[in-house]
Amino acid sequence: MAGHSQFKNIMHRKGRQDAQKSKLFGKLAREITVAAKLGTPDPAMNPRLRAAVIAARAENMPKDNIERAIKKALGSDGENYDEIRYEGYGPGGVAVIVEALTDNRNRAASDIRSFFTKSGGNLGETGSVSFMFDRTGIIEYDRSVASDDAVLDAAIEAGADDVVSGEGGHEIYASTEGYRDVAKALEAKFGEPRKAALIWKPQNTVAVDDETGEKLLKLMDLLNEHDDVQNVYANFEVSDALVAKMGG
């Protein structure tokens, strides 16, 4: 059941890409506001909002900022954001999924298409690459929360599909239908996770050479630094040495 986290070295770059806290907090606040607007403003009754609040806490976003983002959803003068998923191919034919929340669809599409084109890739139609990914739930805990065996046993009992434990922590995967129940069971045992969300997990990853990898990592940077982009997923692996070289 346990295994290697094939795309972890790409996900690790997210921390560096969002090094500017003001930009990161803006993205987190946007997700909180949208989640609260689509459901109830009570995180205990709104799974998406709870996931957004957990993500904000994990980045040490001040409590006042979180509460302000929730209250913003209750007002009538707040911005309206569209949720859009972009799909395309990066350098080397690598599949890329981009999730965005934008108040200007034309601007977002133009910018993201430009990023793909400049990197030597191309933006495709919705559905053009998502078939190579699985929509799945992920619950993450720090390494120190419990032993690998303890986490594995608890995850199996809770109904998880897979567990990956390593130096970076524990990752528990569950179906889209069951992950909230799994997260609730694990939280009762280990406390609040550092992450609980739905993601696009690549079914397989491809190892790329350093030249292609550098182009791909630059594309990841461009996408993640855009204000409208919330999440980026791709199905490639690069060497740890390249990630370190580029400051990941």
Curated annotation (Swiss-Prot):
Assigned keywords, A-Z: Cytoplasm, DNA-binding, Transcription, Transcription regulation
GO annotation terms (biological process): regulation of DNA-templated transcription
Transmembrane segments: none
InterPro entries in the record: Integrase-like_N (IPR017856), TACO1_YebC-like_2nd/3rd_dom (IPR048300), TACO1_YebC_N (IPR049083), Transcrip_reg_TACO1-like (IPR002876), Transcrip_reg_TACO1-like_dom3 (IPR026564), YebC-like (IPR029072)
Keyword Cytoplasm belongs to the record: yes
GO cellular component, one term: cytosol
Region (Disordered), start-end ranges: 1-21
GO molecular function terms listed in the Swiss-Prot or TrEMBL record: DNA binding
Localisation per UniProt entry: Cytoplasm
Family matches, as SUPFAM superfamilies: YebC-like
Pfam family, one: Transcrip_reg
NCBIfam families: PRK00110.1 (NF001030), PRK12378.1 (NF009044), YebC/PmpR family DNA-binding transcriptional regulator (TIGR01033)
Entry's family note: Belongs to the TACO1 family.
Protein name stated in the entry: Probable transcriptional regulatory protein blr1534
UniProt source species: Bradyrhizobium diazoefficiens (strain JCM 10833 / BCRC 13528 / IAM 13628 / NBRC 14792 / USDA 110)
